[in-house]
Amino acid sequence: MFTSSSIINNLKQSEGLEYKKLCRLLKITKKSDKDKLDIALKALETLEIINKNEDDEYNCIKDSDHLVAKIRCSSKGYCFAVRGKDKEDIYIKENLLNYAWNGDKVLVRIIKEGYRRRSPEGIVDCILERSNQILLSKVEIINNDVYAIPIDDRILSKIKLPKENKKYTF
């Protein structure tokens, strides 16, 4: 299985990749996986992280405003995009997380520069890799909709569950 991060890493290592070659590098053979790759490529193009040139080759945009970081959230609801030891952390407001969870590898765009001793503020544009594939949660009904509420209070988003599937334990 590929991630947005593996797509970007493969494109950064080359001058341009054709779709078939990218599929080979990512070891994609199934039609369903190719459909998922198409969706990911369109999303990355829309975010202006990659582009497709006139030769139908995909390239990584060098001067992109996006930074790769890891999300760290506190139980009090404060979230930061951590970039590394020597780089300043970026504050992410709860409504700008775009369903990123604590520990996820993400692409962040700075929307407000830091001043004095305040951190810059940013928005999560793309989740590159999920840190947790499994989420332990409790199921609650809110306004006739069914939600999974994460037990880990560092995960700030609730997940709406389909009503058709009545296998939820209450």
Question: In which residue ranges do the predicted regions lie?
Answer:
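Charge-lined substrate channels and their catalytic hotspots, especially those that engage the 3′ end
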Residues: 1-170
